[in-house]
C-alpha cells in the first residue's frame, strides 16, 4: 500500500514537471492581490496631501519629481495591461524563464537603476497629484478585479516583453510600483525636500 502511494506521488510530480509550471493556485492569487493592495496603499500614503512644491521638487536636472514618478506609473498602466492581456498561451512547458523571487526583488532592490523606455517616460501633462491618483485608481481597480476573478491560467501564458509568465507580469506591475514608491521615499528624504 505504501509503495503504491509513493509511486502515485512520484507519477503526479513527474506529470507536473513534464506539463511545466502548474496553473496559478488560489494561494498565489491571494498573494498577488495582497501585494497589489499593499503597493496601492503605500502609493496613496506617500503622495496624498503633498503640496505643489513637494510634488514638483527636483533634486537634480536628471531626477524625476514625485509628480513625474506618479505620471510614469499612470503612463505605463495601460501599456502593462495590454502586455498582460496579449500574453500568449504556451503549448507545453514553462512560460518564460523568470522566477518569482527575482520579480519580488525587483521591487525591493533599487541598486540597479533602469532608464524608462521613451514611450513610458512621464507625459509631463499631469497637472497635479489628485488627477494622477484618480487615473491610477481607475487602472489599478481594473487590474485588481481581473486578478481576483480571472479564469485565465496566467502561469501558462507568456509575456514576451519580459520573458515571464502572466502571473509574474501581474506581480511585476505591482513590484514596479513598489520600486517607484521607494524612489518617492528617496526624494522625500533628500535634505532639500520642502517641508511644506
Where are these regions (language model features)?
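Short, contiguous alpha-helical
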Residues: 57-105, 145, 149-196
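Surface-exposed, polar/charged faces of alpha-helical domains
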Residues: 34, 49-53, 64, 86, ...
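Short, contiguous, pocket-lining structural segments
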Residues: 24, 31, 35-38, 61, ...
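Short, helix-capping/interhelical loops that line the mouth of catalytic, cofactor-
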Residues: 16-31, 82-136, 161, 190-196
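Amphipathic, well-ordered alpha-helical segments in soluble domains
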Residues: 39-46, 76, 80, 111, ...
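Extracytoplasmic/secreted envelope proteins and their assembly/folding machinery
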Residues: 33, 40, 44, 66-70, ...
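N-terminal secretory signal peptides
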Residues: 31-75
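Bacterial N-terminal signal peptides
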Residues: 4-16
Amino acid at each position: 500500500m505504501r509503495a503504491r502511494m509513493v509511486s502515485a506521488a512520484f507519477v503526479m510530480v513527474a506529470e507536473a514537471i513534464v506539463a511545466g509550471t502548474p496553473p496559478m493556485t488560489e494561494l498565489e492569487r491571494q498573494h498577488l492581490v495582497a501585494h497589489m493592495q499593499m503597493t496601492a496603499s503605500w502609493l496613496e500614503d506617500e503622495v496624498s496631501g503633498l503640496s505643489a512644491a513637494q510634488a514638483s521638487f527636483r533634486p537634480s536636472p536628471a531626477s524625476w519629481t514625485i509628480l513625474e514618478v506618479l505620471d510614469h506609473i499612470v503612463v505605463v498602466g495601460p501599456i502593462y495591461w495590454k502586455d498582460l492581456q496579449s500574453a500568449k498561451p504556451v503549448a507545453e512547458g514553462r512560460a518564460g524563464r523568470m522566477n518569482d523571487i527575482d520579480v519580488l526583488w525587483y521591487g525591493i532592490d533599487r541598486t540597479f537603476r533602469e532608464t524608462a523606455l521613451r514611450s513610458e517616460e512621464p507625459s509631463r501633462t499631469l497637472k497635479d497629484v489628485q488627477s494622477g491618483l484618480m487615473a491610477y485608481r481607475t487602472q489599478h481597480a481594473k487590474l485588481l478585479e481581473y486578478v481576483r476573478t480571472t479564469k485565465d491560467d496566467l502561469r501558462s501564458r507568456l509575456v514576451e516583453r519580459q520573458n515571464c509568465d502572466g502571473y509574474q507580469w501581474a506581480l511585476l506591475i505591482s513590484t514596479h510600483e513598489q520600486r517607484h514608491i521607494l524612489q518617492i521615499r528617496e526624494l522625500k528624504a533628500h535634505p532639500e525636500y520642502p517641508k511644506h
